[in-house]
């Protein structure tokens, strides 16, 4: 999938990463006064995955995105990492991701909660 914008920016790859530990509603119900049905009815959630660091998950997803885009790290102009759960406040998690991916471009964290993805796109396309 390629999305073109008037600024010339494109989305040419994407990636995903999930924590290794699976916690189901049944797991939660065995430890607290709730049930799978009660949680699903109110949230639509049946399971969640936890584990891993933000940087580790970001690197895993970024490697997938680079592969799908048939792109090398030296072709990246800017790394914008949208998160509300950084590994540390200082240094920015994006700096660790930048290092682990071998990127030579600038890198920045962006904390905008649920709208972080949209703000990251606008920031990247605006550069």
Where would I find each of the regions flagged by the language model?
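Conserved "HGTGT" condensation-loop signature of ketosynthase/thiolase-family condensing enzymes
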Residues: 1-78, 99-101
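Conserved catalytic cysteine-centered active-site region
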Residues: 38-42, 46-56, 83-127
């Amino acid at each position: 999938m390629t999305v073109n914008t008037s600024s010339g920016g494109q989305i040419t790859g994407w990636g995903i990463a999930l924590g290794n530990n699976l916690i189901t509603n049944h797991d939660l119900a065995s430890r607290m006064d709730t049930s799978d049905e009660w949680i699903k009815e109110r949230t639509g959630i049946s399971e969640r995955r936890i584990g891993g660091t933000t940087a580790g998950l970001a690197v895993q997803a970024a490697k997938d995105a680079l592969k799908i885009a048939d792109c090398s790290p030296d072709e990246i102009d800017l790394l914008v990492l949208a998160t509300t759960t950084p590994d540390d406040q200082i240094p920015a998690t994006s700096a660790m991701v930048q290092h682990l991916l071998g990127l030579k471009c600038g890198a920045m964290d962006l904390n905008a909660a649920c709208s972080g993805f949209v703000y990251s796109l606008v920031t990247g396309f605006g550069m």
